[in-house]
A protein has these predicted regions:
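N-terminal ligand-binding/catalytic initiation module
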Residues: 1-108
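Adenosine-phosphate binding glycine-rich loop
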Residues: 26, 185-273
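Flexible, glycine/charged-enriched surface loops at secondary-structure junctions
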Residues: 48-55, 86-92, 127-129, 152-154, ...
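Glycine-rich phosphate/diphosphate-binding loop of Rossmann-like nucleotide-binding domains
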Residues: 107-166
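A general structural motif
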Residues: 165-172, 190-194
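Rossmann-fold NAD(P) dinucleotide-binding segment
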Residues: 171-187
C-alpha cells in the first residue's frame, strides 16, 4: 500500500498494489483521511481477487472546500489521467457523475443490487423477508421485489426481525454493540466495510451470518447483471459454511488467488476497525 500525491491540487490516491491497473472510488471533502482511503482500496483489492483479476484496489481523496471543488476535481482528473496507470474510478462522496473524464467508471446501482440480493439468497435460500437501511435505492428495492422478498418497514433496521439485512450507510455502521442487537439472520453489505472486526466475531457467536462486503458489492465490476448474480452466488456458496464464517472464508479465498502472483500478501484484511 502506498500513497501517491497529486501535484496539481491537494489530492492523493491510495494504491494497494503497484504496477497493475486498478479500480476504486474518488471522494471529495475539505479533508479526506488517508487511513479511510487505504481501507477502501484494500476492500477493492479483495473484490478483484475474488473475481480472479490481477488488479489493485485504489481510493482517491480530493481535499477541497465548496468554493474550490470544481477546479480541484478537474485538476485531479486531468493529472491522474496523465499518469497512464490504468486506473478506473467511480464518483463517491462529494463527487458528481461525469466529473472524472476518461478515468470514470459509471456507478451502476442495478448491478450492485443484483449482486447483493444474489449474495443474500445464496446464504439464505429460504429467505422471505428483507430490511434495508436508509441508503437503499430504487434498484435494490426492485431487485428484492423481483425475487419475491417482502420488505419489512422499521424505524431501526438494525433491530428489525427479518431474514436479510441490507446495510451500507457508512464504514463501521455495525460495531460489536450493534451486532448484539441484530435480529436478522444474514447481514448483506451494500457499501464498503460496514461491519467492524469485533462485530464479525459477535455475529458468529450470535449465529448471524455476516457476508463479505467485497463480494456482495462486486456486481459493478462485472458489467452485466446475470454474470454478477452467478458469480456472487457461487462465491458465497463456496464460503458460507466456512468454519470461521463467510467473511473470513472469503478473505482466505481471495488470498489464495493473490498468493499465486504476489511475492507477499498485503498486510491486513478488509474490515473496519
Amino acid at each position: 500500500m502506498f500513497i501517491r500525491k497529486a501535484t496539481s491540487t491537494d489530492a492523493f490516491l491510495a494504491v494497494d498494489l503497484g504496477d497493475v491497473p486498478g479500480h476504486g472510488v474518488v471522494r471529495l471533502a475539505p479533508r479526506i483521511l488517508q487511513g479511510g482511503a487505504k481501507d477502501l482500496a484494500r476492500s477493492v483489492t479483495y473484490a478483484l481477487a475474488s473475481l480472479e483479476r490481477r488488479e489493485t484496489g485504489v481510493s482517491a481523496g480530493v481535499n477541497a472546500t465548496p468554493d474550490g471543488r470544481d477546479a480541484a476535481i478537474a485538476a485531479f482528473a486531468d493529472e491522474v489521467a496523465g499518469w497512464d496507470a490504468g486506473y478506473r474510478l467511480t464518483a463517491g462522496k462529494g463527487v458528481f457523475p461525469g466529473e472524472l473524464g476518461t478515468l470514470e467508471d459509471p456507478t451502476d446501482a442495478a448491478l450492485l443490487a443484483s449482486g447483493a440480493v444474489a449474495a443474500g439468497l445464496a446464504a439464505c435460500p429460504d429467505a422471505g423477508t428483507a430490511v434495508v437501511d436508509g441508503t437503499a435505492g430504487a434498484a435494490l428495492v426492485e431487485e428484492l421485489t423481483a425475487h419475491g422478498l417482502s420488505l419489512v418497514e422499521a424505524d431501526d433496521p438494525l433491530t428489525a426481525t427479518a431474514d436479510l439485512l441490507f446495510v451500507g450507510a457508512r464504514m463501521g455502521a455495525i460495531d460489536h454493540v450493534a451486532a448484539d442487537r441484530l435480529q436478522a439472520r444474514v447481514v448483506v453489505p451494500t457499501g464498503p466495510l460496514p461491519i467492524t472486526t469485533r462485530a464479525v466475531a459477535h455475529c458468529r457467536r450470535n449465529g448471524v451470518l455476516a457476508l463479505p462486503d467485497f463480494v456482495t458489492t462486486a456486481g459493478p465490476l462485472m458489467g452485466e447483471a446475470e454474470a454478477a448474480r452467478d458469480m456472487v452466488s457461487a462465491i458465497i456458496g463456496d464460503v458460507v459454511g466456512h468454519r470461521d464464517g463467510p467473511l473470513l472464508g472469503a478473505c482466505e479465498r481471495a488470498e489464495a488467488f493473490l498468493a499465486g502472483w504476489l511475492a507477499d500478501l498485503p498486510f491486513g484484511r478488509p474490515m473496519a476497525a
